[in-house]
Each structure stands twice: as structure tokens, then as C-alpha cells.
């Protein structure tokens, strides 16, 4: 076993890192409905590519509206009153989830290798962090399965009143490409814990780990129709979920632009419940009294983790004037140390962007930063001859009106801005349509508490960044989304509260 982390903030002990599988065989490329594998109704398939070398991995069945209809029918049948799933003890649902966690742990190496090949994620990150988080999240939800219950209510009059926390029903779940397996688990685990059935659409760029999970869900013993997985494209399969009249809830992680379309579709159809985890442009505020070593390192990781492809990336770094130049110097030095390459190889610290579209978007935003007057300190262009690699890029002298300071870049591009006063930086930090996360680095508890309450964000970190746990709710303010995932709050998103009142002859206290 080995430890990772700084002396002042050590990370938990992590398992030893094995070598990735050298010859990964892709077994599951069809649509998963009713615990069975199906070709798409149309017979269409789409290609899946490795972003590190642009080579085709395989072809996957392309689901569309007809396949979503099939999956919803299966999920609805599994949710019927009297079905094996609806009559199952809550503790048994928890046992099945724990069994699923055991299987994920057993196949951790396969899934981590798949995430690296399919999504360009560093194998070390996938194995140690992503798979570790998946297993913990499943077990956390498993533990809650028989602890979700209502209350008795002291209603006036001769009545006995209680509440029931019932599953919402059939849940459509649309998964992003940046954390395909983690987001799959974030969505299915609480839904199943509460007794719902699900129809999942993984991102077309990264469908492989979700399909592999279908095999584990069947092996764990979940009844047919409880989990259905339909790979496909947003405008077809995703839109079919959003507009479906027999889906009771949709949960989506992705761009704010698509989130708006999903909420609009819900409003135009059956007013299905909607949980949205959308974009961000998160402020990270560094005061002169902060521990500069830790602040610079957390700011670096908070931006460059997974090639900057994180919704919570600390992409607006505000540094107090007295330490600005030194902070910029350290940031440049840190970025220049990166080793880019095949995410399966040991020693590689940055992999590729997910696809050509994202690659070009990031390069265009870098060019806009140059044209608008930001100082390019390092990086600024593509890397290598093959794959969608971009050099770690640092800009200084960034102003709030520049595109790179306003738009979500979703790439390895760090923007460093200067501030003088507390009131000024609070206003600037909140001057955005987003509100997903924020951080402040200071040794002054009064400053920390001031910012914890003043910053308009669903998560505020103090003297750390990207600290996540299955117990902690996560979600956005403003246009970064609605609702919460993880923690007890996340479970509440998957239940409906019903009030039951019974007339009785006499009520006694």
C-alpha cells in the first residue's frame, strides 16, 4: 500500500497500482434491456475511438427513440405494483447494491483500463480515484436502503397521520463523458437504493464502462428491467428520454445549454422531476496570508486534473496583489513539469482531451486569450503528432471581460487574475451565471467564514480543492443546475413524500 498527499493534509491509504490490462477485450457493445443484450431497432451502430491515438476501439449499437421506448416499457414493468422489485425488502436492495460493489471491486482493473482507453483518463486516476469513489458510493447507498422512511405527524383532530417516502418511478439518467463510470454510479446507486427503476444513456464518446456495468448488474441479481442501458446520441436517445411521457424523473450531468433543453422538454411534456448538474466557472481565491505552497498546488490540481475536463475546475483564480507574481511563477513552474502521453503508461501526468471537437474549442479559446491581451506564460498549443493533446497552458494578466475568464473552457488552461480587497473579489467571484463550486485559501478564520457565506456556489472549499465524498451533497446554484447528488440530500431527489391520514375514534398523546 502507498500513501498520497501532503504532510499537512495526508490522503487515505490507497491500494497499490497494478499494470493496466495489455489486451483489453470489449465484450459488451449492445443495448442492455431486461437483463438481455439487444441490437438497436434500427440496426445502426456508431464507432468509439481512443482519444490518445485516434484509433477505433469498436462499434456500439446506436439506440434512438424506439430503443428508449423499449427500455422504458421494461423499466415500467419492473416498477409495477407486485413486481419482484417493488415487493423486495429494502434490506435486500441494500444487499444487491453491496454485491454490485463487490463485483466492481473484483473487476476494478478491467474497468480502469477501459476508462483510460475509452475516455483518455490516466489509468492511475481511474484505478485509484474513480473506481475507489464508485465502490464507496455504491456501499454508501447500500447502507441507506433500509433507512429511508417517513414519520408520524401530530395532526390536529382525531386522526393518525404518517408520511411515506416512495420511489419516484422510472428515472431517465443521462451520463457525461468526462467521468463516465463515476457519474453512472452517482445516478444509479441512489435511484436503486430508493427503489426506482432506471433507463441510462451513457455519452456516445464513452459508452463502454456503462455497458460493462450492465453485465455486473445482471450478475449481482437485480431483477430484469430494473436497470436498462441505451447508448446513443443526445439529439435522438437523450431527447427521447427528456420528452418521454412515461419517465417520471430525469437526471442529467453535462452542459448548461443541454440542461436548458431538458428542463424545457420536461415542462412541455409530463413535468417530470429534473435534477441537473451543469457547467461551472469556479472562483478560487488566494489570499496573501495563505500557505502559498499548498495554495499553488491545490490551484494547479483544481484546474489541471483530468486535463481540465471537470465541471468544478477552479478556472478563475483570484490572487491577492502582494503574492501575485510569486504565485504566477510557481504556477508556470508546476505546469512545465508535466509529462504528456498515453494515459496507460506509468509516469504520464496528462492524457488527451476527449475528442476533436473539444480539442479545437480549447485551442480557439486559447487564441482568444492571446488576442484579448492576456499574457501567455507557457503552453498554448497542441502536443504530439497523434491524439487530442494540449500543452498545459497558463495565462496571467487576465481581466474579467476576456472570454477565457467568462466561458467554461473544459481544458488544461489556467487563468490567473489579481485582486486588492475582500469586497472587490467577492463581487467579481459572484459575477457569473454559474455557481457550482468555489474555494478560498487563507489562515484567517473570519475571512474563511465570510467567503463561505458570501460565495454563490453549491460547494465552497476552504484551504483545499476538489474534496469529494459520497456523504457530501453536490450541486449548483444559478445556471450550474438544480437539485443535489450524493449524501442524504441526493437520496431525497429519488423519493416522493406521501401523506397518509386515517380517521380514528380518539387520539391520545
UniProtKB/Swiss-Prot annotation:
The active site is at 277 (proton acceptor), 311 (nucleophile). NAD(+) binds at residues 175-178, 201-204, 234-235, 254-255, 277-279, 357-361, 408-410. Its EC number is 1.2.1.19, 1.2.1.28, 1.2.1.3, 1.2.1.36. One of its GO terms (biological process) is gamma-aminobutyric acid biosynthetic process. It is found in: Cytoplasm, Cytosol; Cell projection, Axon. It catalyses: an aldehyde + NAD(+) + H2O = a carboxylate + NADH + 2 H(+); all-trans-retinal + NAD(+) + H2O = all-trans-retinoate + NADH + 2 H(+); 9-cis-retinal + NAD(+) + H2O = 9-cis-retinoate + NADH + 2 H(+); 11-cis-retinal + NAD(+) + H2O = 11-cis-retinoate + NADH + 2 H(+). The keyword Oxidoreductase applies. Pathway: Cofactor metabolism; retinol metabolism. Belongs to the aldehyde dehydrogenase family. Homotetramer. Cytosolic dehydrogenase that catalyzes the irreversible oxidation of a wide range of aldehydes to their corresponding carboxylic acid. Functions downstream of retinol dehydrogenases and catalyzes the oxidation of retinaldehyde into retinoic acid, the second step in the oxidation of retinol/vitamin A into retinoic acid. This pathway is crucial to control the levels of retinol and retinoic acid, two important molecules which excess can be teratogenic and cytotoxic. This is Aldehyde dehydrogenase 1A1. The gene is ALDH1A1.
Amino acid at each position: 500500500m502507498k500513501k498520497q498527499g501532503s504532510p499537512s493534509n495526508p490522503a487515505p491509504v490507497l491500494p497499490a497500482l497494478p499494470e493496466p490490462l495489455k489486451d483489453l477485450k470489449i465484450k459488451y457493445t449492445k443495448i442492455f434491456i431486461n437483463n438481455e443484450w439487444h441490437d438497436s431497432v434500427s440496426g445502426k451502430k456508431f464507432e468509439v475511438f481512443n482519444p490518445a491515438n485516434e484509433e477505433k476501439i469498436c462499434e456500439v449499437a446506436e439506440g434512438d427513440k424506439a430503443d428508449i421506448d423499449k427500455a422504458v416499457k421494461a423499466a415500467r414493468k419492473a416498477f409495477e405494483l407486485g413486481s419482484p422489485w417493488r415487493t423486495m425488502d429494502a434490506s435486500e436492495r441494500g444487499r444487491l447494491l453491496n454485491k454490485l460493489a463487490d463485483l466492481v471491486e473484483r473487476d476494478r482493473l478491467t474497468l480502469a483500463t477501459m476508462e483510460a482507453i475509452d475516455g483518455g483518463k490516466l489509468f492511475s486516476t481511474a484505478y485509484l480515484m474513480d473506481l475507489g469513489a464508485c465502490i464507496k458510493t455504491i456501499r454508501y447507498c447500500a447502507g441507506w436502503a433500509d433507512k429511508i422512511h417517513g414519520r408520524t405527524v401530530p395532526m390536529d383532530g382525531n386522526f393518525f397521520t404518517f408520511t411515506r417516502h416512495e420511489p419516484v418511478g422510472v428515472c431517465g439518467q443521462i451520463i457525461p463523458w468526462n467521468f463516465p463510470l463515476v457519474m453512472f454510479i452517482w445516478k444509479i446507486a441512489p435511484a436503486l437504493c430508493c427503489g426506482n427503476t432506471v433507463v441510462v444513456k451513457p455519452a456516445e464518446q464513452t459508452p463502454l464502462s456503462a455497458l460493462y456495468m450492465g453485465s455486473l448488474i445482471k450478475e449481482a441479481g437485480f431483477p430484469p428491467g430494473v436497470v436498462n442501458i441505451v447508448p446513443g446520441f443526445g439529439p435522438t436517445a437523450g431527447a427521447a428520454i427528456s420528452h418521454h411521457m412515461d419517465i417520471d424523473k430525469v437526471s442529467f450531468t453535462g452542459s448548461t445549454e443541454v440542461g436548458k433543453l431538458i428542463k424545457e422538454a420536461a415542462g412541455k411534456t409530463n413535468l417530470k422531476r429534473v435534477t441537473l448538474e451543469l457547467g461551472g466557472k469556479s472562483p478560487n481565491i488566494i489570499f496573501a496570508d495563505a500557505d502559498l505552497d499548498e495554495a499553488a498546488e491545490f490551484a494547479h490540481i483544481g484546474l489541471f486534473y483530468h486535463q481540465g475536463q471537470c465541471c468544478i475546475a477552479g478556472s478563475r483564480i483570484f490572487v491577492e496583489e502582494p503574492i501575485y507574481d510569486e504565485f504566477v511563477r510557481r504556477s508556470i513552474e508546476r505546469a512545465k513539469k508535466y509529462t504528456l502521453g498515453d494515459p496507460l503508461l506509468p509516469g504520464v501526468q496528462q492524457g488527451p482531451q476527449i475528442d476533436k471537437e473539444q480539442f479545437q474549442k480549447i485551442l480557439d479559446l486559447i487564441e482568444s486569450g492571446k488576442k484579448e491581451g492576456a499574457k501567455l506564460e507557457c503552453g498554448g498549443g497542441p502536443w504530439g503528432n497523434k491524439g487530442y493533446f494540449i500543452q498545459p497552458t497558463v495565462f496571467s494578466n487576465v481581466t474579467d471581460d476576456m472570454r477565457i475568464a467568462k466561458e467554461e473552457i473544459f481544458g488544461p488552461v489556467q487563468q490567473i487574475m489579481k485582486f486588492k480587497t475582500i469586497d472587490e473579489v467577492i463581487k467579481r467571484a459572484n459575477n457569473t451565471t454559474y455557481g457550482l463550486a468555489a474555494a478560498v485559501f487563507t489562515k484567517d478564520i473570519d475571512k474563511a467564514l465570510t467567503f463561505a457565506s458570501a460565495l454563490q456556489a453549491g460547494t465552497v472549499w476552504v484551504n483545499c480543492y476538489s474534496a469529494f465524498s459520497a456523504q457530501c451533497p453536490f450541486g449548483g446554484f444559478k445556471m450550474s443546475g438544480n437539485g443535489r447528488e450524493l449524501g442524504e440530500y441526493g437520496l431525497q431527489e429519488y423519493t416522493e413524500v406521501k401523506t397518509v391520514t386515517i380517521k380514528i375514534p380518539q387520539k391520545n398523546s
